[in-house]
Swiss-Prot record:
Function: Plays a role for multiplication of the virus in different cell types.
InterPro entries registered for this protein in UniProt: Poxvirus_C7/F8A (IPR004967)
Protein family per UniProt: Belongs to the poxviridae C7 protein family.
Species annotation: Myxoma virus (strain Lausanne)
GO-annotated biological processes: viral process
UniProt entry tagged with the keyword Ion transport: no
Protein name from the UniProt record: Probable host range protein 2-1
Keywords: Early protein
Length: 158
């Protein structure tokens, strides 16, 4: 079977969990998220990476409309890394979360569509993954966060 890291992306502001956004084989992970909106909105992302091994993990990069966004490392232990980012979007946007930016990998990552106007989301292209979407975010996944002022905040350090 080979190496396989697990990547889940939580679009907390929309109550959407993008599960298993990792390639079926190898240590690459990521996805493209296409967001449609009609007004300015703040989006909170929480990215949970569960690596098969911890010696060396590829960093994950986030780009919003081709502009780099820094991810905060909120939590790190032997079996899990949790990153977060908050972005303000004013128009339809494309978000890329990738560990590898080479086209031989990016063409295999899934594409997710999120329409905030119609409250609709779908997997446009699965790529070489078992990606699926859950909404609302389930209680087990929420255990990594605690709701505070409408956002989920990391509580793993307490």
């Amino acid at each position: 079977m080979g190496v396989q890291h697990k990547l889940d992306i939580f679009l907390v502001s929309e109550g959407i969990a993008i599960k298993e956004a990792n390639l079926l084989k190898g240590d690459s992970y990521g996805c493209t998220i296409k967001i449609k909106l009609d007004k300015e909105k703040t989006f909170k992302f929480v990215i949970v990476l569960e690596p098969e091994w911890i010696d060396e993990i590829k960093p994950i990069y986030m780009k919003v409309n081709d502009e780099s966004v820094e991810l905060e490392l909120d939590y790190k232990d032997a079996i899990k890394r949790i990153y977060s980012a908050e972005v303000v979007l004013c128009s339809d946007s494309v978000i890329n979360l990738f560990s590898d930016v080479d086209v031989s990998y990016t063409c295999e990552y899934p594409t997710i569509k999120v329409n905030t106007i119609k409250k609709y989301y779908s997997v446009q292209n699965r790529g070489m993954t078992y990606v699926h979407i859950e909404s609302p975010i389930n209680t087990k996944d929420k255990c990594w966060f605690v709701e505070k002022n409408g956002w989920y905040e990391d509580r793993t350090h307490s």
